[in-house]
Amino acid sequence: MDPPSPSRASQTQPVAPSPLTSYRWHSGGGAEKGAGGFRWGRLAGWGRAQSHQETTASSQPAPRSLFRRVLSAPPKESRTSRLKISKSLWGKNKSPPLDSEPEPENPEPEPELEPLATQIPEAPTPDVPVWNIEAFTLLDGKLVLLGNEDEGPRQPRMGSASSESSIHVASGNLKDPDRTPGKTDPEAAGPHQIHNVRGLLKRLKEKKKAKSELGASASRDGPPSALGSRESLATISELDLGAERDVRVWPLHPSLLEEPHCFQVTWAGGSRCFSCRSAAERDRWIEDLRRHFQPSQDNVEREETWLSVWVHEVKGLPRAAAAAPGVRTELWLDGALLARTTPRAGPGQLFWAERFHFEALPPARRLSLRLRGAGPGDAVLGRVALALEELGIPRAPAAGLERWFPLLGAPAGAALRARIRARRLRVLPSERYKELAEFLTFHYARLCGALELALSAQAKEELAAAMVRVLRATGRAQALVTDLGTAELARSGGREALLFRENTLATKAIDEYMKLVAQDYLQETLGQVVRRLCASTEDCEVDPSKCPASDLPQHQSRLRNSCKEVFENIIHSYNWFPAELGTVFSGWREACKARGSEALGPRLVCASLFLRLLCPAILSPSLFGLALEHPAPGPARTLTLIAKVIQNLANRAPFGEKEAYMSFMNTFLEDHGPAMQHFLDQVATVDADTAPSGYQGSSDLALQLAVLHAQLCTIFAELDQATRDNLEPLPTILHAIEEGRPVPVTVPMCLPAPRTQGHSSISAGEKPGFLAPRDLPKHTPLISKSQSLRSVHGAGSWARPRLEEEQPPRLPRPVKRTQSVPAGRPARRRPSAGPRPRPKGSLHAGPAPRGRPWTGASASLPRKPSVPWQRQMDQPRDKDQALGTHRPVGKLAELQCEVAALRQDLKMLSGLVESLSTHIRSLSEQQEQLRTQLQLLDSRLREGTAKLDPGRDRSTNEGHRLKSLECRLAEIESTQAQLKDTIQNLQLLPRTSESQSQPVPLKAPCINGDTT
């Protein structure tokens, strides 16, 4: 419990003793508010209460920690390892406490909601130190800072901050803050350190001892801003996070720190911010740290919130408020700042057109959009308060709620136009989605074919994104994109004009996959040049109707130079082109070759890479993360013209009469056409040494499957019964997951033949009980019944690499610097400004050695599989099996003899096989000769038979005469029957006079029966 404050205790009147009053209750609710703020008062009061406990309470159990854990997190498990941030990650200067946000005068009351524990960390200020994650490594559960004396947190960015964050230090978390820097912590130098970390840390600390003592004794003159971020490197040598329960890892929106790819680690005593080289590296670090603190996250049920906000425009603000430096829109969720827009200034309406998307948010209740001046200390101009329950389905449309929202606290008529979409997901344990993952893995082509005509464009985009994310986590995204692209080729019938130009599930899946794997490629290839063009004020308009004729030559020259720069960046980007995309493009070209349309291979690559990725990224850099905001009209026109030129160059299509003002660029297209075709051939060539493995997952698979389950349930609710029956057992699986009961059906497992060579197929007698998604390309299993998943091991089971993935031992070499742990790529420092050196000159004559894919798995840290049913397979089943994997040294000679005998047998068998092959070839030749002789004899026999039977023609004539006689006999019989009928008729008639009766004339009978 929390201790009462001294002031409140002094005012308490004495009461009669009771079992409740005999115990000293600890409550920090009324602690004094000092300079550290309310939270620091709670911590100080709690610490004093713990250090001055009465003897009567010593036998009572330990008080419950006042730090609350995240509601979506599982209970903390007992473990001995602790995550520590070493090498002085804390500074003397601390940020001021978080004050309440200034509200507008006389604000209108917001709807009262039931209080909810804050679970989103407080946003950091833009001037906090940001640590480069490349200087850290994760060893034995410890986040260790390594490097020379010049390394440290990045310089803080000075600027206006519209939000404040409080950082407090709990005294119980510090480990010997005043100890000598040269000393080595015994726990850090334990026997379980690998690669001699103990000696490494000791040498680094001794190396900095002299400078640390000198820096401590030297006077610090000047303002704190002049000292930069080096002030935070002086006192703390080790910060223990393992003792806290409220440790959270949180991705940060780029608008908060004006730095991309950052994440924040918070605990009860403070927080630290880290920056990564790419979004993929940031996601891997977040996953590793979260799994350390929440090892059983995949085995518990939790709730997550997805939120998408489109901020369009605002109207009705006072002219003075919209003046420079402008107005921002801030996104607050349950009192925590998530992101902010770029500032906009000017008279009239202010336009942003910015989109914010957040995944895996904790359960939240209220969203607030606040308009605030961009200057330092500006007040809130107005706000929009919304309850998330009103924004979800079915209360709001599936596309989100879009309208003009009145601004509270603003003048009458002021409104903000935005579109908001929220979804609350119930995420079940991973094994509950096992059958759904199996169906998607084995039958995605069948699912896409059945739903293609029944979905809208938005539904296709969402379903394709969910499928790609799930299959990327299980290692089958490449197969999905390759198969869908091949199906799109067959659907278009070889017509180039239709390739990847329609809104189909194939095109949406390809778009999502390229955004995932080529995010860093876009930044490295187009990021710098696109940002320079967005900030440029040079006019490149070449339409004579939109610019003076005197400026036209200068504008054409600028456009030509800009197109050349962009094109050279693209064709020289082969060395860092994603290997995953190269594998997909190679599969497409092989499919075109198998169909007899080899010429369509480059067109297919061009339509996907340029039409769906590179040119859209040039047109809309803000949508692809190349710029923070949409460019101004002038730079936007320049980017549009550049995208036109690059697309026509890729399509080998010169400008015609439709865009006659661009005809001056046709010479540019002719000159650079061969280089473009060479680049298309390069990116579609697979390098076996750098080809990525099938398993690349680093995301929350349970969350992605929950999203897919929710989308499929929404889709199947509107499908006709025939389509549902055609997709069985998927409807049964979805219904069983929704009701929380076991799936009563079996998922048939069948896969096409593997595309790559080198995978061993399963023998006819082996039938595995369960096939891991990572091993799908190796086998074609036949499983009679979906089996229940094995129990998931703890966090320590994934730290050991699998036997088949172990690399051969490398020669020891001096340790200069560690690698960034999840990235697996040598760390390098990139300059903050200035152009990046790029290879110039002629193109590569052949395939250049491709660098390590940025999205590849880490080489220094064994990755924990996201698929829970794979983790137990990463290690031997029992101790005996682990021991049985190593042969005793004493049997080496025996094994060598066996190998020699087997080699002799192999040689004998090889000779026998060769002799049999020779004999078979000779028999085949003899058989061919005998067949030829038989045909010759048959022809001679027919000729001799014809010569020996000269009366064959006479017998033929007699046969014809016999047939004619038969016909005449039939005619006579018919005449005779007619005669009999006539005689009978005459006998029945009454007799009349002979003058009136006339006999029927009959033909005179012929003697020989011939009428001729």
Curated annotation (Swiss-Prot):
GO molecular function annotations of the record: GTPase activator activity; identical protein binding
Biased segments, Basic residues type: 826-841
Site (Arginine finger): 501
Annotated Acidic residues bias: 100-113
Descriptive protein name: RAS protein activator like-3
Start and end residues of each PH domain: 193-294
Domain C2 residue range list: 285-405
Compositionally biased tracts (Basic and acidic residues): 175-186
Organism (species): Bos taurus
InterPro entries reported for this sequence: C2_dom (IPR000008), C2_domain_sf (IPR035892), Ras_GTPase (IPR039360), RasGAP_CS (IPR023152), RasGAP_dom (IPR001936), Rho_GTPase_activation_prot (IPR008936)
